[in-house]
Amino acid sequence: MATATIALQVNGQQGGGSEPAAAAAVVAAGDKWKPPQGTDSIKMENGQSTAAKLGLPPLTPEQQEALQKAKKYAMEQSIKSVLVKQTIAHQQQQLTNLQMAAVTMGFGDPLSPLQSMAAQRQRALAIMCRVYVGSIYYELGEDTIRQAFAPFGPIKSIDMSWDSVTMKHKGFAFVEYEVPEAAQLALEQMNSVMLGGRNIKVGRPSNIGQAQPIIDQLAEEARAFNRIYVASVHQDLSDDDIKSVFEAFGKIKSCTLARDPTTGKHKGYGFIEYEKAQSSQDAVSSMNLFDLGGQYLRVGKAVTPPMPLLTPATPGGLPPAAAVAAAAATAKITAQEAVAGAAVLGTLGTPGLVSPALTLAQPLGTLPQAVMAAQAPGVITGVTPARPPIPVTIPSVGVVNPILASPPTLGLLEPKKEKEEEELFPESERPEMLSEQEHMSISGSSARHMVMQKLLRKQESTVMVLRNMVDPKDIDDDLEGEVTEECGKFGAVNRVIIYQEKQGEEEDAEIIVKIFVEFSIASETHKAIQALNGRWFAGRKVVAEVYDQERFDNSDLSA
C-alpha cells in the first residue's frame, strides 16, 4: 500500500523554517486540507492518480492514531523550544542585571571582564563534569560504561572514539555528568577498578590545565559551605527520608534532592548542608557506600558552591507548571501563525503522514524497547509495544540547583484511596500507612531502619517469566503472537519479550530462552502463573514465575 506524504515548501525550499514550527504547521494544515475542486486527478508519489470526483478515502484507524501522535509530538517540540528560548532569555536578563549592579557599585566598566569571567566559569564547570576513562576492553560497549558510572550521578553523554576500519572503539571514552560532584566521585572511586578483565584508568581530561585556576577558585568558595553530595538515592525515598538518615551526624540546614521538572520525581542525587564542618566530614566517612534500600549511596564533599545564577530557572520566576502552561500557549500561537504562513507561501501535496522531521525522530512519550542487561550477554528477539509513557527532558548544563519542581499533588485520588483502605482493612487491623510514617520524627540508626522497612513495601510485580518453554531453534516469527494470544486469556498483556541468554563467552555455550510477559495489574499476573506453571508445551514442562518489577523496569533480564 503506497504511503501518502505531506510536502511543505517555503520559498521553493523543502523543510524551511524552524523544525518545531514547521512540524506544528504540517500537522495543523493536514487537518484543514480539503481536496481541490474541479481537478481531474491528483498525482501520487508512485505515479498513480486518483479521481478527485470520488474524493479522498477516509483515514484508517492506524493513520488517525499516527496523526494524533504526530500532533502530540509537534506540540511537545514546540513547548520544548519555547521553554529553551525563555530560559536563555532569563539567564541573559540575570547577567544584565548583575552587570548593571556592578556599574552602580562603582566597579567601572565591568561588561567585558564580567562576561569573560562568566564564560570562564562555565567552561571550567563543563570540564569539571567530564572524566576520561581509558584502558577499556574492546568488547565492552557504551551500555557497560554507563552502567558502571551511573551510580555517581546522572550521565549527560558518553563519547567513545571508534575506528572506522575495525569498527571497534579505541579503548577510551569521555563521560560527562550533570554536576561536577558526580565526576569527582567517579574519579575518586573508579580509577583502577576491574572492568571486563582490565583495570580501567580514570582521570581528568587533558584540557583541564587552562581551567585549573578557576577550578581552584570554585573549590575555595565551596569550602565556605558545609555541603555534601549524595548520589544513588533510591527512587522511593523522599527528601525527608534522606534528611532523617543524615541528621544523625549533626544539625542540617538544608536537604534537597534534585528533581525532574517534568515528572516531579527526584533524579537520584541531591545536596545536604550542615551547620558544622565536622558533621559533613562524619557524614561522608560514614555514609559513603552505605547500603540503603539495596543501593549503595555515593557520598562526597561538594566541590562547587551554590550558584543560582548558573542554574536554568523558569522564566520570570514562574513556578514550573505555570512556565509550561505559558510555553504551551506560546507554542499554540506559533503553530497557528505557521499554518497561516504556509497557506500563503506553501503548497500541500496529498494528505497522509507527516514531514520527515516527525517521522525520523522518535515521538516523545513512547517507551523504548527493552535491552539486555550488560552483565548477561543475550539477544532479544521480540518486543511488543509498551504501555506507559516516559517523559523526555533536556539535561541542563552547569551546576544544577536541586530546588526544582515539587511532585504533582494527588488530592483527587485520596478519597478513593482511603475508601479502598477501609474496605480492605478493618480499623483494628489496619496497618500503619506510609503517609503516616513520613511525618514521624526519627534519626540515626532508627531512621535507617525505618527507611529500609518503607522500601520493603514494594509494589507487586506485573511481570511473569516463562522458562523451559522453547529451544532457541524453535523461535519463529509467530511465537510472540502465540504467547500474547495465550496469555491474553488471563488479562491485558502490555508486552512480550523473548530473550535468549547465552550461558558463557564460548561460541558453543548453551543458550536458554526466557519469555517475559507484562500484564496490566498484578492479579492478572498471578492468575496466569497459576494456570501456566507446570503446564506441558511441545514436550517441555513450563516454569512460570513472578519476575522482579524493578529489574524488569531497568531492562535487567538476567535473573
UniProtKB/Swiss-Prot annotation:
Family annotation (Gene3D superfamilies): 3.30.70.330
Lineage: Eukaryota, Metazoa, Chordata, Craniata, Vertebrata
Name the record gives this protein: Poly(U)-binding-splicing factor PUF60
Role played: DNA- and RNA-binding protein, involved in several nuclear processes such as pre-mRNA splicing, apoptosis and transcription regulation. In association with FUBP1 regulates MYC transcription at the P2 promoter through the core-TFIIH basal transcription factor. Acts as a transcriptional repressor through the core-TFIIH basal transcription factor. Represses FUBP1-induced transcriptional activation but not basal transcription. Decreases ERCC3 helicase activity. Does not repress TFIIH-mediated transcription in xeroderma pigmentosum complementation group B (XPB) cells.
Similarity comment: family membership: Belongs to the RRM half pint family.
Positions of modified residues (N6-acetyllysine): K251, K454
Positions of the UniProt region annotated as Disordered: 416-437
Modified residues (Phosphoserine): S112, S244
Free-text domain note: The third RNA recognition motif, called PUMP domain, is atypical and may rather mediate homodimerization and/or protein-protein interactions.
Gene Ontology BP annotations: alternative mRNA splicing, via spliceosome; apoptotic process; mRNA splice site recognition; regulation of alternative mRNA splicing, via spliceosome
GO molecular function: cadherin binding; DNA binding; identical protein binding; RNA binding
Region (Inhibits transcriptional repression, interaction with ERCC3 and apoptosis induction): 77-559
Acetylation is among the record's keywords: yes
Glycyl lysine isopeptide (Lys-Gly) (interchain with G-Cter in SUMO2) cross-link site: K43, K80, K419, K458
Tissue: Isoform 2 is expressed in colonic epithelium and colorectal epithelium cancer (at protein level). Isoform 6 is expressed in colorectal epithelial cancer but below detection level in colonic epithelium. Expressed in heart, brain, placenta, lung, liver, skeletal muscle, kidney, pancreas, spleen, thymus, prostate, testis, ovary, small intestine, colon and peripheral blood leukocytes.
Disease cited in the entry: Verheij syndrome: A syndrome characterized by growth retardation, delayed psychomotor development, dysmorphic facial features, and skeletal, mainly vertebral, abnormalities. Additional variable features may include coloboma, renal defects, and cardiac defects.
Record's keyword terms, sorted: Acetylation, Apoptosis, Disease variant, DNA-binding, Isopeptide bond, mRNA processing, mRNA splicing, Nucleus, Phosphoprotein, Repeat, Repressor, Ribonucleoprotein, RNA-binding, Transcription, Transcription regulation, Ubl conjugation
Subcellular location: Nucleus
Biased composition (Basic and acidic residues): 427-437
Keyword Transferase part of the UniProt annotation: no
